[in-house]
Amino acid sequence: MAPQKIALLTDSCADLSPRLAAENHIYIVPLRILCADGEYSDGVDIHSADIYRRLKAGELPQTSLPSAESAGAVLEEIRDAGFDGVIAVMLSSGLSGTYNLVRLIAEESGDAFPIKVFDSVSGSLGQGLTVLQLAEDIRNGMDWETLVERRTPQLIAGTFPFFSVDTLEYLMKGGRIGKVTATAGTLLQIKPIITFAPDGQLQ
């Protein structure tokens, strides 16, 4: 029998506020942020303002995928809340292993608790808006089969986020662009428009 009460799962890179997430039955798996003084959970005990402050001080925090334990705990919380199915839309697999982590957990859960996991091929605004649109579709009564077979793939395929950055320094330090590209862009004062390639990496 197809799930009737459907929850949504995403990760902290969707940049959804706690209020928006709670209002829309969206559960968040926090990525880990590795800093000089320890490990933090994104959006839980470290926030964007903290990260920007560290960057300005010369530190380069690194992201890491959530632990299997934390992802499993969120799924257990969803089940305990009375939901009987989950649609998960995760950060682009070209940037993180979060999608594959949740996919493996979903495979282990079997058919007893259906979890359909999608690679957003996106992040931040693109990922978050996809999840919010699915929340609206669920409120409007869209059924499980339509959501997982058609609607979610359509939303992902039709989402094209573009963004720019003030400096190329952190993209270079994080390994997202090469040193030559970053140096040339800085010297020429170029601020490129960045988006996601079909493989989910930044281009």
Predicted regions: what they are:
Residues S70-V102:
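N-terminal glycine-rich phosphate/adenylate-binding segment common to multiple enzyme folds
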Residues G58-E59, I78, Q154-L155, T159:
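Alpha-helix boundary/capping residues
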Residues I6-A73:
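N-terminal glycine-rich anion-binding loop in soluble enzyme alpha/beta folds
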Residues Y40, L60-S67, M90-L95, D119, ...:
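Short secondary-structure transition/capping motifs
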Residues I46-Y52, A81, R103-E108:
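A short glycine/small-residue-enriched secondary-structure motif
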Residues A2-Q4, C13-Y27, L31-R32, G38, ...:
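Mixed-charge interfacial surface used for oligomerization/domain docking
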